[in-house]
Amino acid sequence: MTYVAASSDAIPFPAAHFDVVCSLNSLDHVADLEKTVAEIKRVTRSGGHFLLLTEVNHPPTATEPINLPWSISNTFMDTFRLVDEKRYEIGDHNIHGQILRDARFDESNPANRPGIVLAKFERR
C-alpha cells in the first residue's frame, strides 16, 4: 500500500480510479465540503462503492467546523445509489464503539440532538 498526502478537495488521482472510497469520521473536518464531495464522486468508478461514517447535527467546533445534517446522504444521491444507511446515538463520541454496540438512534425521541450516520453507496 502506498500512502499519498493530499487534500480531500484535490485528490491526486484520475477520475474513476477507485473501486472503494471511504470517509470515516472525517467529512465534518474538511476545509471545503463542496469540493471534497465533488472529489469523492469524481474518483469513484462506476459500480464502485463509497462508505460514509460521520457525526451529524452537532455544533461546529475548531476541529469539526462543519455541521452536517441528518440528510447528508442526499448530497451524494445525484451520483450514487444508497445501498444502506443506519443511524446511531452519539453516546460518548466513540463512533466505532457505538456501531459495535449497535446503539441505534432512537427516532421516537423528538429532541434535536447529534448522532452518527453510517452509509454505503454504489456509484452509478
Task: Tell where the protein language model's regions lie, with residue ranges.
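Conserved S-adenosyl-L-methionine
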Residues: 81-92
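Core SAM-dependent methyltransferase catalytic element
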Residues: 93-124
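A short acidic, Gly/Pro-enriched loop at the edge of an enzyme's catalytic core
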Residues: 6-21
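A short glycine-rich, Lys/Arg-flanked "PGG" loop and its adjoining helix->strand segment in the class I
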Residues: 34-49
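Short N-terminal helix/helix-N-cap motif within the alpha/beta-hydrolase-1
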Residues: 16, 31-35
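Conserved class I S-adenosyl-L-methionine
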Residues: 49-80
